[in-house]
From Swiss-Prot:
It is a multi-pass membrane protein. The chain crosses the membrane at residues 102-124, 139-159, 167-187, 191-211, 228-248, 250-270, 324-344, 359-379, 396-416, 422-442, 462-482, 486-506. It comes from Arabidopsis thaliana (Mouse-ear cress). Keywords: Chloroplast, Membrane, Plastid, Transit peptide, Transmembrane, Transmembrane helix. GO terms for molecular function: phosphate transmembrane transporter activity. Inorganic phosphate and probable anion transporter. Expressed in roots. GO terms for cellular component: chloroplast membrane; plastid. This is Probable anion transporter 3, chloroplastic. The gene is ANTR3. PROSITE patterns: MFS.
Length: 512
């Protein structure tokens, strides 16, 4: 709750209105926060502006003679209450609906990744107990990707057709069920474990296309990268939460503890999401007209006003080089990301001989900084676009940072002599890789706004294949060569090659 003192009226519209000059309140106003005093006065948003204080006073005096209440008005993009020279003694703000949407989306992304990480940590005691080799450990780690690869394309098409709300609700419910069944499957048989993890991946495949499509509908262009950055910050924080909580629960409760916890949180999220979110802002019963105008500003065509069209042919999509730039970027991003996600605890334990809890702490630090840097990458992208830089140049700058930085860091990781030094290089690699969120991940909405879910599914399908190869390949490389160095070097040069392709062929202009 904020309190402001006596203020002079702001006569820039058809009424005598008081607008708080507190800079914090003003900033909230520009973001679309609604003042409670505005709701009580039932302010009309359609009033025209008037150039002088006297003009506003004359019109209000005329209204009083007609026994009508003086008009109150809405400043551009924000409602204000009060009237005449009355001071606003107390201002309470109500959170914009789009902020609620991005917070719930970030929570979903946090659960999405935490559920993956639980297995990355729990697999270490399982491997010791069941006698798995490094190569078979890679098979188990990659098993969720077997289902993920199929749901990426299907999930993207479903999101384009039905919207992100319903698809996400079903996806989270099903992957929470699979998470709950994982310890039972591990105790039953290896085959059952692989099947449950594949089903888990099948359900999780809808998360990314749903997130990008939903946020593109709820946020204006100059806020979209920040919204994705916040959601992906939640995604990366899922790594931190999973890496820190899982060892504690494994030691105190057992294998089933962390799986039951995160499955329960997922089902709780579904109940909240289903009752509080709509696919499009104009369908929300809670959104204000001022916030809706702010969202729609700069959007020449709204998704809800477009008649549904069939997805373009795969041949047409693949005939354009910007599509291939996105596909190769997704392949490289997933290759490097899943190597670190699946093998980081194992890396610290085998290379530096630290215990599981210490390995989890060293692994958590890079993901925590990635969550923070991802938000700032999105904010920087939005700032560059607002200040006149072309979307194409911004996407190329962000993606170049997101690939060149990790490539150089992984090469340096080969020379790390202590777990602390290795954690620093991994932190730099993952922090800079988060700039990809403002690169290829947003570029799908740029080149194909009507088919972004379908395009995301296609590129994510290729990226999932790369993740399977890299996750399994790391295990074989380690088993054959006895170290991680060779595979880290291969991954670094893949980052460099994809950066060149991206700079040559990526675009921020609409293609489809």
């Amino acid at each position: 709750m904020a309190t402001v003192g006596s203020l002079k009226p702001l006569h820039h519209s058809s009424c005598s209105s008081s607008f708080p000059r507190n800079p914090i309140v003003n900033r909230k106003a520009l973001l679309g926060f609604v003042f409670d005093s505005a709701r009580k006065n039932q302010i009309r948003c359609e009033n025209l502006r008037y150039s002088s204080e006297s003009d506003g006073k004359r019109r209000n005096a005329a209204a009083k003679k007609r026994n009508q209440s003086p008009e109150r008005c809405a400043a551009e993009g924000v409602l204000t209450g009060g009237g005449g020279s009355e001071a606003i003694a107390e201002v309470r703000t109500m959170m914009p609906e789009r902020i609620k949407v991005v917070i719930l989306t970030a929570c979903m992304m946090c659960l999405c990744n935490a559920d993956r990480v639980v297995m990355s940590v729990a697999v270490v005691p399982l491997a010791d107990k069941l006698g798995w080799s490094s190569s078979f450990l890679g098979v188990v780690q990659s098993s969720f990707l077997w289902g993920y690869i199929f749901s990426s394309v299907i999930g993207g098409a479903l999101v384009d057709r039905y919207g992100g709300k319903r698809v996400l609700a079903w996806g989270v419910a099903l992957w929470s069920l699979a998470t709950l069944l994982t310890p039972w499957a591990a105790a039953h048989s290896t085959l059952a474990l692989l099947c449950v993890r594949a089903f888990f991946g099948l359900a999780e495949g809808v998360a990314m296309p749903s997130m990008t499509t939903l946020l593109s509908r709820w946020f204006p262009m100059d806020e979209r990268a920040s919204a994705v950055g916040i959601s992906m910050a939640g995604f990366h924080m899922g790594n931190v939460v999973g890496l820190l909580l899982t060892p504690l629960m494994l030691s105190s409760i057992g294998i089933s503890g962390p799986f039951i916890l995160f499955a329960s949180l997922g089902l709780l999220w579904v109940s909240t999401w289903s009752s509080g979110v709509t696919n499009n802002p104009q369908d929300s019963p809670f959104i204000t007209r001022s916030e809706l105008r702010l969202i729609q500003a700069g959007k020449p065509v709204q998704p809800s006003t477009i008649s549904p069209k069939p997805n373009p042919s795969l041949r047409l999509l693949l005939s354009k080089l910007p599509t291939w730039a996105i596909i190769f970027a997704n392949v490289t991003n997933n290759w490097g990301y899943f190597v670190l996600l699946s093998w980081m605890p194992v890396y610290f334990q085998t290379v530096f001989n630290v215990n599981l809890k210490q390995a989890a702490w060293f692994s958590a630090l890079p993901w925590a900084t990635m969550a923070i840097s991802g938000y700032y990458a999105g904010a920087a992208s939005d700032f560059l676009i607002r200040t006149g830089h072309s979307v194409t140049s911004v996407r190329k700058i962000m993606q170049s940072i997101g690939f060149m930085g990790p490539g150089l860091s992984l090469l340096c990781l080969n020379f790390a002599k202590s777990p602390s030094c290795a954690a620093v290089f991994m932190t730099i690699a993952l922090s800079l890789s988060s700039f990809s969120q403002a690169g290829f991940l947003l570029n799908m909405q740029d080149i194909a706004p009507q088919y972004a879910g379908f395009l995301h599914g296609i590129s994510n399908c290729a990226g999932t294949l790369a993740a399977i190869v890299s996750t399994i390949g790391t295990g074989y490389f380690v088993q054959w060569l006895g170290s991680f160095q060779a595979f880290l070097t291969v991954t670094a040069f893949l980052y460099f090659a994809t950066t060149v392709f991206w700079l040559l062929f990526a675009t921020g202009e609409r293609v489809f």
